[in-house]
Amino acid sequence: MKQIAATSGPTNIGLLSVGSYRPQRVVTNDELCQNIDSSDEWIYSRTGIKTRRFAARDESTASMATEAGREAIAKAGLEASDIDCVVVATSTHFLQTPACGPAVAAALGATGVPAFDISAGCAGFGYALGVAADMVRGGTAGKVLVLGSEKLSPTVDMTDRSNCFIFADGAAGVVVGETPTQGIGPTVWGSDGTQATAIRQDIDWMDYLDRPTGPRPFLRLEGSAVFRWAAFEMGKVGQQAMDAAGVRPDEIDVFLPHQANSRINEILAKSLELRPDAVIANDIEHTGNTSAASIPLAMAEVLATGAAKAGDLALLIGYGAGLSYTAQVVRLPPG
């Protein structure tokens, strides 16, 4: 019987670079408090957020992803023609079709390559990174551009005191390719659909079309439920990722959790028993929660500020809508 040929790729892969894009407009807590009964102190004490970035009207998920991708490609010392695949993690590409990925690939000049979106909420970047890593190891792509890009500000009800101060906009991403030593550990991922309503769009699009003069859809969040789930369940996921990578907690140099809430991140760091001197990303303070963009944005920030350096061992944990989660151990790329 004729055998179908198989593909195989390199054993050792890693992150070749990281690129980011942050919109120019900085939005303070005080500005948001003009629409709600709250204060800068109250918001900061409960979330760790002081400011966040909102994209301009003419900026889109695709345009921000393109800027972040352009920087990531340049920092890797590559040309767009060297990229074999583009994966965009997003939940805020405001077209049902076509996907964001092909437009980003075309804008970058990566012509003819596979390009697609992954929608897994705030865990999206980790999902996309897991898919990209498997593609390179499997030999179906040599270099994959993985992007997280979100424009969440239009999805938020600015009179909703429970979450209008949480979400924000931005994009960042990495190039995945062959490296001399192993730079990406196995992906640990999963979901809990029984809690799907904890982070949700409150009105179905078909229901909205039936009542176009009624209230429009918004993003809603059951903050207490998500806090409990993330703070007390995601530590187990992080430990599983370290076990899968053959790494001990005291060997982790940098902790890069999804930037949802600084209090959650502090609880996770303690439960994971990381070293006291391990760097804990806190990009949320001035960036807010950018969903699928938050982990690569935080990665870019710790490298740019010198808090971390290339080659440091980092634990990534993403979690959010679905509810979905993911974790990996990686070596940080050059900043």
Swiss-Prot record:
It is found in: Cytoplasm. GO terms for biological process: fatty acid biosynthetic process. Its main location: cytoplasm. InterPro entries: ACP_syn_III_C, ACP_syn_III_N, FabH, Thiolase-like. Pathway: Lipid metabolism; fatty acid biosynthesis; Lipid metabolism; mycolic acid biosynthesis. GO terms for molecular function: 3-oxoacyl-[acyl-carrier-protein] synthase activity; beta-ketoacyl-acyl-carrier-protein synthase III activity. The keyword Lipid metabolism applies. Its EC number is 2.3.1.301. Signal peptide: none annotated. It is an enzyme of class 2 (transferase). Residues 259-263 are annotated as: ACP-binding. One of its GO terms (cellular component) is cytoplasm. It comes from the Bacteria. The last Arg residue of the ACP-binding site is essential for the weak association between ACP/AcpP and FabH. Homodimer. Catalyzes the condensation reaction of fatty acid synthesis by the addition to an acyl acceptor of two carbons from malonyl-ACP. Catalyzes the first condensation reaction which initiates fatty acid synthesis and may therefore play a role in governing the total rate of fatty acid production. Possesses both acetoacetyl-ACP synthase and acetyl transacylase activities. Its substrate specificity determines the biosynthesis of branched-chain and/or straight-chain of fatty acids. This is Mycobacterial beta-ketoacyl-[acyl-carrier-protein] synthase III. It comes from Mycolicibacterium paratuberculosis (strain ATCC BAA-968 / K-10). The lineage of its organism: Bacteria, Bacillati, Actinomycetota, Actinomycetes, Mycobacteriales. The gene is fabH.
